[in-house]
Amino acid sequence: MGFSEWNLIWIDLEMTGLDPSRDRIIEIAVVVTDSNLDTLAEGPVLAIHQDRSLLDSMDEWNTRQHGRSGLTERVRASTVTEAEAEAQVLAFLKQYVPARTSPMCGNSICQDRRFLARWMPDLEAYFHYRHIDVSTLKELARRWSPEVAEGVRKSGNHLALDDIRDSIHELRHYRREFLRMPA
């Protein structure tokens, strides 16, 4: 299956912190699935160059996490700007999904949308205004069916492509075990 308004765009960003007014995007990845959550294509996975002073100002959690994963060094070595990353991702998505048809899919996706609106507005505008936020099902399962929530295993390495794969896997799990729908 190729180009379709029913395809879903999954996105994840890694950032220097949680405040889009002062923090920046340092990694972006996208995956396109069909409506049954079968992967059609994995898009660009890009470390985005940011100034050393910004990287040096990250809080302890981000410094440790992105240092351990190797992302900080990838960002330092990268020559890709936010504008170039945005253009590459848009060019990829236009092969699979018409503009403003796919909800933004991922985990805690509102946070990613806030950063896209600030730093990559053309990409943010490519999405429909709705979301498929896997974290909603996670929170409901934790409250209503804890055994279902406990059945989810994630890589936890906080790299954008791995986080997307984890989110798709997690939604498949909730579809099967929580929503009780066949795959």
Swiss-Prot record:
Sorted alphabetically, which SUPFAM superfamilies does this protein's record hold?
Ribonuclease H-like (SSF53098)
Extract the CDD domains matched here.
Orn
Q: Which UniProt keywords apply?
A: Cytoplasm, Exonuclease, Hydrolase, Nuclease
Give TM segment ranges.
none
Which GO molecular function annotation, any one, does this entry have? 3'-5'-RNA exonuclease activity
The EC number(s) given in the record are 3.1.15.-
A GO BP entry is: DNA metabolic process
Q: What class of enzyme is it?
A: hydrolase
Which residue ranges does the record assign to the Exonuclease domain?
A: 8-171
Q: Where in the cell is it found?
A: Cytoplasm
Q: Which GO terms describe its cellular component?
A: cytoplasm
Q: Where is the active site?
A: Y129
**What InterPro entries is this protein classified in?**
Exonuclease_RNaseT/DNA_pol3, Oligoribonuclease, RNaseH-like_sf, RNaseH_sf
Q: What does this protein do?
A: 3'-to-5' exoribonuclease specific for small oligoribonucleotides.
Spell out the family assignment given in the record's similarity comment. Answer: Belongs to the oligoribonuclease family.
Q: What's this protein's name?
A: Oligoribonuclease
* Organism, scientific name: Halorhodospira halophila (strain DSM 244 / SL1) (Ectothiorhodospira halophila (strain DSM 244 / SL1))
Q: What is the lineage of its organism?
A: Bacteria, Pseudomonadati, Pseudomonadota, Gammaproteobacteria, Chromatiales
Query: Which gene holds the coding sequence for this protein?
Result: orn
